[in-house]
């Protein structure tokens, strides 16, 4: 085994070592600070066999079809936690089943949560008076767009909410939220 002489080993000066240490520390801090930003723009998808997000109640418990229909009547529109945790309306259709689509409850004007007014049979925003029909289509401004749609699927009694990327059936246009 041969040993290298001291003249064959490159020397690192104190200044070069401190520069590398400072650069390495600054790079580590910058990457650590960028992680939440990257995670915001590319969030992890929550589980569900078919790629959907499990709809959750106000306590964060997964919703089941049988449990939901036992406590909600036909025509009911109630809030659940949907995609990205956004408030989403599950609709019980007139046949007594859960509708095939849900509505994101965030007003397209300034982001207020839009409550369902069963007396007026429409969604009315409390912030600036925007109104949406039973399917979430804007009928009175200042909201410029209809409420976002989401697919609602049932898999093994679990209620799943999935991204809607097809044509918006209310306007026959591409979805603005996709």
UniProtKB/Swiss-Prot annotation:
Record membrane topology: Single-pass membrane protein
The record's InterPro entries line, in alphabetical order, gives:
Cyt_b6_f_Rieske, Rieske_2Fe-2S, Rieske_2Fe-2S_sf, Rieske_Fe-S_prot, Rieske_Fe-S_prot_C, TAT_signal
Q: Does the keyword Transcription regulation apply?
A: no
* Keywords associated with the record: 2Fe-2S, Disulfide bond, Electron transport, Iron, Iron-sulfur, Membrane, Metal-binding, Thylakoid, Translocase, Transmembrane, Transmembrane helix, Transport
Q: How does it assemble?
A: The 4 large subunits of the cytochrome b6-f complex are cytochrome b6, subunit IV (17 kDa polypeptide, PetD), cytochrome f and the Rieske protein, while the 4 small subunits are PetG, PetL, PetM and PetN. The complex functions as a dimer.
What one GO molecular function would you report for this record?
Answer: metal ion binding
User: In the record's cofactor note, how is the cofactor described as bound?
Assistant: Binds 1 [2Fe-2S] cluster per subunit.
Q: Which residues of the sequence carry a binding annotation for [2Fe-2S] cluster?
A: 107, 109, 125, 128
Instruction: Supply the EC number(s).
Output: 7.1.1.6
Q: Which gene encodes it?
A: petC
SUPFAM superfamilies documented for this protein: ISP domain
* UniProt cross-references to HAMAP family, sorted A to Z: Cytb6_f_Rieske (MF_01335)
Q: What's any GO biological process attached to this entry?
A: photosynthesis
Positions of disulphide bridges? 112-127
Q: Where in the cell is it found?
A: Cellular thylakoid membrane
Q: Does the record carry Cytoplasm as a key word?
A: no
Residues crossing the lipid bilayer are 20-42
- Annotated protein name in UniProt: Cytochrome b6-f complex iron-sulfur subunit
List the catalysed reactions: 2 oxidized [plastocyanin] + a plastoquinol + 2 H(+)(in) = 2 reduced [plastocyanin] + a plastoquinone + 4 H(+)(out)
Q: Describe the location of the Rieske domain by residue ranges.
A: 65-161
- Group of enzyme by EC: translocase
What Pfam families does the annotation carry? Rieske, TM_PetC
Q: Name one GO cellular component term.
A: plasma membrane-derived thylakoid membrane
Q: Which domain of life is it from?
A: Bacteria
Q: Which cofactor does it need?
A: [2Fe-2S] cluster
| Additional observations | The Rieske iron-sulfur protein is a high potential 2Fe-2S protein.
Which CDD domains does the record associate with it?
Rieske_cytochrome_b6f (cd03471)
């Amino acid at each position: 085994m041969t040993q290298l002489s001291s003249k064959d080993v490159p020397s690192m000066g104190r200044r070069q070592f401190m520069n590398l240490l400072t650069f390495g520390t600054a790079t580590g801090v910058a990457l650590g600070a960028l992680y939440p930003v990257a995670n915001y723009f590319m969030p992890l998808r929550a589980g569900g066999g078919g790629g959907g997000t499990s709809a959750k109640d106000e306590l964060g418990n997964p919703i089941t079809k049988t449990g939901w229909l036992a406590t909600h009547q036909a025509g009911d529109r109630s809030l659940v936690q949907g995609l990205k945790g956004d408030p989403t309306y599950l609709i019980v259709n007139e046949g007594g089943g859960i509708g095939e689509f849900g509505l994101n409850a965030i007003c397209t004007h300034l982001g207020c949560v839009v409550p369902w007014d069963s007396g007026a049979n429409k969604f009315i925003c409390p912030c600036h008076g925007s109104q949406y029909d039973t399917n979430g289509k804007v009928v009175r401004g200042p909201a410029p767009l209809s409420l976002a749609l989401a697919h609602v699927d049932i898999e093994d009694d679990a209620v799943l909410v999935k991204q809607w990327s097809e044509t918006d059936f209310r306007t026959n246009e591409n979805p603005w939220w996709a």
